[in-house]
Amino acid sequence: MKKKTSVRTKFIRTATKVAMPALQVLCAPPKLENIKKALFIQPHPDDNQIGAGGTIAYLVNKGVEVYELTVLDDRYTDLTYKGEGYTVRQKEALAAQEKLGMKNAGFLGFGDRTRATSREIADKITPIIREIKPDAIFTVDPNLASECHEDHIKVGNAVKFAFMDAGFDFVPELVDGKPHTDTHNVFTLGFYYTDTPNTIVDISDVGEFSCYPMFEGIHKEEEEYDPMYTNGLSAMNGAPCYGTRTVRYRIEDGE
């Protein structure tokens, strides 16, 4: 004898069927078409271009205002740097930004292999997020299974912390006992250098072009700098895809 389906089971099945379309919409990755302003945060000068150069060019071509923030640089390892102006790798970053049509959000001033913690780095990133107020933030995936670079892991986690902290009015601490009034909620957090992509970006319209010319002029000026150690890129189009993990993607009702 066939067992009857209980009323409870029927209700659950019906509710699931009705709710599924809405759940699929809510759980879907954010669309790049909704981004008006983006902030790409890289551990080192070149990471954004290598990992997401094509996506950056794609966004810029769509009219998106794209900023770049560099966390680490060679200020302690560039032997030609005298403490003023820009280091070789900072110049490379600025040249890459100009080539791609990005805006510079600054250099945080941490040296390669910094002893600073992810929390300390996050506290420096949070005010910049609040100032720029991006719709989306992109950085390296700190959870990449094969990631062994401590700088990448540390900065990736710092960006995750800052992504959340920017929306809290009590972070980093109250000002004269009062909450912050410049908080900003970011709705999309994207990771490149990822092994779990959920979004593929078609960058075929961007075209292929080399990054090397933007560095060539820099190294001609730096006679003491050995070009064998250049941080130049071989291709500006970067990886043909980027991965996004929606840590916090909400639909506001406008209230």
Where do the model's predicted regions map?
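Active-site rim/loop-helix segments in enzyme catalytic domains that contact anionic ligands
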Residues: 2-132
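Metal-dependent de-N-acetylase/amidase catalytic core
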Residues: 2-41, 118-255
